[in-house]
C-alpha cells in the first residue's frame, strides 16, 4: 500500500514541477507561479555572483528572458516523507544554458508547493 501512496505523491510532485517547467517554456512567470508558495525562495550562483532571495527573482529573470521553447527537463529524483519532499531536476537549453535545480516542497491544503529552489548553472 505504501508504494501506491508514494507513487501517487510522486506523481503529484511531478505535476507541480511540470507547472514550473511550462512557465519556463512559455516565458511567462504567471504560468509557473502556481507551483511555488508565495513565500518561496531561490538561491544559486550566476557566474561568480550569488543570487539569493524571494522567488520573485526567478519570475523577473524568466519574464526578461522570454520563452524557452527548446527547454528539456528531466526529474532525476523525488524523495517524499509524509508532507515534505525534495526533488532534483535537470534542465537543458533554458536560454541556451543547462541547470540543475533542487527543490524542497511542502504539502499545503492537499497540494504540493515548492518552498525553495536552489540551482546550479552549468558552465558553458
Regions inferred by a protein language model and the residue ranges of each:
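Residue-level detector of alpha-helical recognition elements and their boundaries
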Residues: 28, 35, 46-48, 102, ...
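Surface-exposed, charged secondary-structure patches
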Residues: 8-12, 41-98
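Short, low-complexity N-terminal intrinsically disordered segments enriched in polar/charged residues
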Residues: 1-30, 34-38
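Short secondary-structure capping/turn micro-motifs that flank functional sites
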Residues: 40-41, 123
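Short beta-strand segments enriched in hydrophobic/aromatic residues
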Residues: 36, 91-93, 118-119
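Short beta-strand edge/turn micro-motifs at domain boundaries
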Residues: 98-124
